[in-house]
Amino acid sequence: MKTNKKQSSPTPVSKKQLPVDPIVNSEPITAKAGVSIYHLKVVLEGTKPLVWRRLQVPGNANLGWLHAVLQVAMGWSNSHLHQFLFGDQVCSDPSSGLEDNNPSVLNESKVILSDAIPNQKDKMTYEYDFGDSWNHKIIVEKILSADPAASKVALCLDGARACPPDDCGGVPGYADMLEIIKSPKHPEYESTREWLGDEFNPETFDLEKINACLRKLKWPRSTESLLRKALMERDDCQE
């Protein structure tokens, strides 16, 4: 049931200079004095009932690392392009090629979370897969003082429901799938179930497994390799 989709380009925006993270791709992020802790609510827009997560992350994380956290926490496969949008800014992975057609696209590894959305109630959008166009609304719920003893750099605090499967046709396609698997007599029930896999349950939310996988994202020099490892081992993640 996979769909053929053409990746679209982001809308051109004005570019302004944002602070560069002095430790990007050099040292792991650790909670320490002076580094605020963000509580973010992430809502997958258009899903009914809502698919959402509540995350705790350090405010000095860059958006490239946040992308890795979102992929693991939501349940995506990191097999499509993505971008962050806030204000009039667009940020993405420079290896995606988006900057080739739009030089105003910022390098996500040089944009810091606390600079992009510095205040409580600030919002940004994380779009994954420009064909299916999965838009995640990210809302700053709380900004807390850092706990010097904190050891986890990313934590899922709460959430609900499983992530839709990649390549299912976006919100409309996923809604159709949910209707089909409710009725074993539906003519597409067997093929849809086979494509989804027997273990897929749209109501499943495994907080323990998500956090076990998030602990693999320690962000030393290569976020991408650690994300790849976390996704490959996701089914086997244990406490």
Language-model region placement:
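Short linear regulatory motifs enriched in tryptophan with gly/pro/ser
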Residues: 1-239
